[in-house]
Amino acid sequence: MDERIKPTAHYHLPGLFEFYEFYRVFLPLFYEHREWFYDWCDIGSIYGAPADCLWDGGRTGYGDDDPRAVLSLLREYGISARLTFSNSLLREEHLSDNKCTGLCALFNESETPRNGVIVHSELLLDYLRQRYPKLY
């Protein structure tokens, strides 16, 4: 019998904080009713940053949901979160921002699935590697 490995398309979805209420409804449907969706697609991650996040790249996101609730939802479905910290103008004095460091500490705690960060700044990348080694 020819057992072929079926390729899977891993989708990386936007709006980690901005679309939290949508994902609270969509994710149960996606995982509990797989027959409604193509079997060759999967959710690789959901990315974003909350409103007023200094390390974000200036996007106009309006998500202000509790980061613990957001993380809990993704853990429930085994989905990786990716924080978008793509601000290209960061300087060393910005690295101590309480909101951003708090988010990193929270998302760094998750063993399974591992969470990641999308960065632009080498300065921020080095900082994150040293202080939050579980983030990829």
Region roles according to the model:
Residues 2-11:
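Extreme N-terminal starter segment of soluble prokaryotic enzymes
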Residues 13-34, 40-136:
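Active-site beta->alpha loop and helix N-cap motifs at the rims of alpha/beta catalytic domains
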